[in-house]
Structure formats: C-alpha cells, structure tokens
Amino acid sequence: MNLFLITSAIHTNYSNTSPEDRLRETIDTAESIKKYAPDSKIILIEGGKPLPQHIKDRLSIFNEIFDFSDHPVMQMTQSDAQLAVDNVGHSVKSAGEAYILKEALKKIDGTYDRIFKLSGRYRLTERFNIQDHIHKDKYVFLPKAPTDKMNMIDADAKTIVTKSSIDFSPWRYETTFYSFDNIPKAQMIFEYIFNSLVETYSEGNYIDIETATYLTINKEDVIEVPVIGLTGVLGMDDRSIDK
C-alpha cells in the first residue's frame, strides 16, 4: 500500500483564499488521490489554526488527521518566521511544514511501499504514473529549478545562513509533490531542515524549504522525473501550474 501525506493549513493568516474555499480544495486533493492512486491511505497533516469539529466532520474522506495546529512549536515557528516576513514581504511557511512532516513521520504505523508528500489544495492528474516513483531508497522530484531571488538576502556574501551549515544555492527542488520510501532517513532530513530554518529565521535571514531541501538531500539519493502529474494554483501568485 502507498501512503499520501497531505500538508494543510485550512485556517491561516497567510492567504487571501477563504477557509471555506481552502477546505473544499483540500477535499478535492483527496478525491484526486482516490481517482488516480486508488487503495492508497491518505493522512491530512494540519498545521493551521485549530479546526472546529464541524470542519473535521467534513474531512471524513481522509483516513486519518494529524492535527498540529495548537502545538506550541508551531506558534514559536510562526513567531520566528515573522522576522523573515518583515525582510522579504513574503509569508514564511517553510519551517512549519518541515516540523509537521518530521512529527507526522513519528506517528505513522505500518509499512508502505511508497510515501507521497502532497501539498493540500493541489490535485493529481491523469499524467500521474506511480511507476515513475518505484525507486528503492530514492526521493523522486521534478527536475531541480533555479532558486527564487528572494533567497538572495545577502547577495554580496553569497550566503543565506550564517550558522546553520546551509549556504546559498542557485537551485531548489519543488516540494509541492514528491515521494520517498525510507521513513527513518526522511525523518532525519526533515529534522535537520526544520532546525536549520528556525535558526535562519531567528537570525533575521531567509531561505525557503525548497532550497533547503535541495541543499540537504544527497543528490545520489534523488531521481528527477520530467512530469509528475500535479495541478493547482499557487497560493501567493494565483498562478496555475500543471506539471
């Protein structure tokens, strides 16, 4: 069996989209998985504001919900990240995502052929081919892409992080949708990324999870595929993607 981990923030201050629309789109995410990856287990990992029970009742399409919305670390992460928000005028959600992923992996029971991380509100398409992901002990990503210019806070020094061992990179991995099969290894990766991002933000610097992921994962452990079968609208840009 395969497992889909859906990272979500249905109620959040960092979006112009209403909670009702975000809820509907998150349900659409699960429905697309049932269509294109039937018999998979689907877990919602919620990191936004606490969900009222009537909202949780509408999320029955998910096999489980891991709710980290009221966790003290999530509140701390948002506070530290505000430093970077002030610097670059952009909502920083990367540390929160790394945190809920590393914590979610600790709660997973059972063995799975493949674990897919998919951001809520995006959907699988007919171009999704599960065979593209069958690579033991490998991460499967879309091809690396140029780093967003917002990561270049200290262009003169060519570095973003001063103490966390993450340096400037011209490349990033798209983390909206990817897969892996080694849970202990992935848990260590997310732990390292989370600690590095929090340290970075607390120093008033900025790096996103996409660039940090590229810098952290051993390139020999990565398989890049040209098409991954994903569609949706980028929340910050209102720009449609189909990859």
Where are these regions (language model features)?
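ER/Golgi luminal nucleotide-sugar-dependent glycosyltransferases, focusing on the catalytic module
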Residues: 1-243
